[in-house]
């Protein structure tokens, strides 16, 4: 059996390795133009899913940071804690750099004889893949290619009228296992630890404010309740 996965993304890399481990042949087909770079992006993975990834491939070099509790604040309540998510002595989830986990699974898949990477010059060629009888199963996990637009054009969309700004702050070393979410008048701001001296920041700012980078940095420092920032956000 040969399976085709459309899109060179984290979802398909994990799926491809899992299928290949069952001795199935997998082709990962992708258009270079559709590749998105996530240099500073971080993702949260639940403990169960993280354990599953490690169990699936024990040699995978995934650098993850445990988050034991999440605190929620609101600017309207003068930054008083609204509530906290916490499981005693158990990590709520793990934070990992997208680039780290992506590169880890890409390296694993590249060395697997049952997995092939195939580049297509234009996403319009995807129609020929649909009609290719050598594939028993075809899975499309891209959100914006020709096939998605053609076959999945009915969808519900929600426009939040905001832009997400991401970065990483270097700060004085502390015990850093608490994630923080602050609802500000500009939009929600999250501080997501990735080490004892580095924290990922995600600030979703409503478009109506049209803030410059220097103003955004000043707001992050203003709403920062925990960290002693060493230098400008990267």
Where on the chain are the PLM-derived regions?
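Glycine-rich FAD pyrophosphate-binding loop
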Residues: 4-8, 17-41
């Amino acid at each position: 059996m040969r399976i085709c996965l459309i899109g060179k993304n984290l979802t398909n890399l994990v799926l491809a390795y899992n299928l290949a481990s069952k001795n199935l042949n997998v082709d990962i087909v992708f258009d270079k133009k559709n590749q998105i770079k996530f240099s500073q992006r971080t993702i949260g993975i639940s403990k169960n899913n993280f354990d599953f990834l490690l169990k699936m491939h024990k040699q995978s070099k995934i650098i993850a940071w445990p988050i034991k509790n999440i605190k929620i604040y609101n600017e309207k309540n003068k930054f008083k804690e609204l509530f906290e998510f916490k499981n005693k002595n158990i990590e709520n989830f793990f934070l990992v750099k997208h680039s780290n986990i992506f590169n880890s699974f890409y390296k694993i898949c590249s060395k697997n004889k049952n997995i092939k990477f195939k580049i297509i010059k234009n996403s319009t060629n995807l129609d020929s893949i649909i009609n290719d009888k050598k594939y028993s199963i075809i899975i499309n996990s891209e959100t914006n290619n020709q096939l998605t637009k053609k076959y999945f054009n009915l969808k519900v969309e929600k426009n939040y009228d905001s832009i997400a700004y991401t970065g990483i702050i270097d700060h004085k070393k502390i015990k850093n296992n608490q994630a923080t979410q602050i609802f500000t008048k500009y939009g929600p701001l999250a501080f997501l630890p990735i080490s004892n001296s580095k924290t990922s920041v995600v600030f979703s700012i409503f478009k109506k404010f049209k803030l410059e980078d220097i103003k955004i940095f000043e707001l992050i420092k203003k709403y920062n309740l925990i960290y002693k920032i060493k230098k400008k956000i990267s």
